[in-house]
């Protein structure tokens, strides 16, 4: 996997992965929270 041993520990893939995870996770948590709130408001 790591052929070059002089490769730095901090590589751009980590930042792209962090961005993708937060772009998907934050609206999902907000959406689930909104649905849960709707269940309590309706009743």
From Swiss-Prot:
Q: Name the source's superkingdom.
A: Bacteria
The protein's matches in PROSITE patterns, at most eight in alphabetical order, are given as:
CYTOCHROME_B559
Where does the chain bind heme? 22
Q: Which residue ranges does UniProt annotate as crossing the membrane?
A: 18-34
User: Does this entry carry the keyword tRNA-binding?
Assistant: no
* One GO process term, biological-process aspect: photosynthetic electron transport chain
Q: How does it sit in the membrane?
A: Single-pass membrane protein
Instruction: Give Gene Ontology CC terms.
Output: photosystem II reaction center; plasma membrane-derived thylakoid membrane
Q: Which residues form the signal peptide?
A: none
Required cofactor names: heme b
Q: Name one GO molecular function term.
A: iron ion binding
Which NCBIfam families does this one have? cyt_b559_beta
- Subunit text: Heterodimer of an alpha subunit and a beta subunit. PSII is composed of 1 copy each of membrane proteins PsbA, PsbB, PsbC, PsbD, PsbE, PsbF, PsbH, PsbI, PsbJ, PsbK, PsbL, PsbM, PsbT, PsbX, PsbY, PsbZ, Psb30/Ycf12, peripheral proteins PsbO, CyanoQ (PsbQ), PsbU, PsbV and a large number of cofactors. It forms dimeric complexes.
Question: According to its UniProt entry, what is the function of this protein?
Answer: This b-type cytochrome is tightly associated with the reaction center of photosystem II (PSII). PSII is a light-driven water:plastoquinone oxidoreductase that uses light energy to abstract electrons from H(2)O, generating O(2) and a proton gradient subsequently used for ATP formation. It consists of a core antenna complex that captures photons, and an electron transfer chain that converts photonic excitation into a charge separation.
Record-given protein name: Cytochrome b559 subunit beta
Q: Which organism is it from?
A: Synechococcus sp. (strain JA-2-3B'a(2-13)) (Cyanobacteria bacterium Yellowstone B-Prime)
The major lineage groups are: Bacteria, Bacillati, Cyanobacteriota, Cyanophyceae, Synechococcales
């Amino acid at each position: 996997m790591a052929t070059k041993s002089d490769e730095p520990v901090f590589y751009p893939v980590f930042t792209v992965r962090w961005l993708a995870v937060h772009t998907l996770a934050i609206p999902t948590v907000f959406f689930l929270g909104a649905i849960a709130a709707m269940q309590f408001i309706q009743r």
